Amino acid sequence: GTMCIGVAATGVEGLKAIIPEAGISNWYDYYRSGGLNVPALQWQGDDLDILAKYCFSRAKDADDYKTVEEGYKAAHAKLVEGEDRDSGNYSRFWDERNYLNQIDNFKAAVFIIHGINDWNVKTNQCLPLFKALEKKGLDRKILLHQGEHIYVYDLENSGTLGMVDRWLDHYLKGEDNVVETEPKVLVESNIDQSKWFASDTWPPEGWAYEEFPVDADSDRLTLRDDLSATVYDKAKDNQKEWLDELVLSGSEDYINRIKFVWDPFDTATT
């Protein structure tokens, strides 16, 4: 998913269409959030330099690696320095790795496929890209399903493969199949996964964001990050019990959490 976004950001000639699945559009927002190090779910400690090391396949061939080892180590050291894990700040290093800055170079039609429950590449990657494409007026489409990371095929009542085929037939083969007139936004219901909501804009027409004030009284709220105040037991690794206590307990005495409670919604939220 990410590679085709990066290629499209170069403005290379001949690239007519891309279909990023769970693609990254801004590397800072993948590894950071407001100055904090925020790795993907189940990838604690991950960062750009570790990903680069993981992807450097030439290291698997000892003889080949010797010919590039010096250059690789120098480039890798620059990654470690540039990512600045100690501060977590947005910098020129990260700005250069923000493909949204190159949106004016995009020429290809973009069909984004992304899982709403993807906690590896989150939706803060696909939605800003779609909005940027929308603002530029480029041919675009986004399919938001209820799956996780890169789970796209055989989605009930989605016709995903048919849409992909029509997209490629139109933009690569020039077939007049009116795919560009189909809804630009498809969102799978989180209640009935056989139903899909269609719209031509994001947010979808008729939808609105709900704001939740977290400090309505302007009082400063604090918590103490201390596992000893919970039921968590490192020896047992009882994460479920810890989560149940954190979320479900009605007690307000826990010093290790801040809990915001609103009245029930009057209408459905999907």
Per-region residue spans from a language model:
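C-terminal, loop-rich substrate-recognition/catalytic regions characterized by aromatic stacking residues
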Residues: 155-270
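Catalytic histidine neighborhood in serine/cysteine hydrolases
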Residues: 133-150
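Glycine-rich nucleophile elbow surrounding the catalytic serine of serine-hydrolase chemistry
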Residues: 1-6, 120
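Short beta-strand/loop motif that positions the catalytic acidic residue
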Residues: 106, 112-114, 118
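Conserved alpha/beta-hydrolase "acid-adjacent" motif
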Residues: 119-127
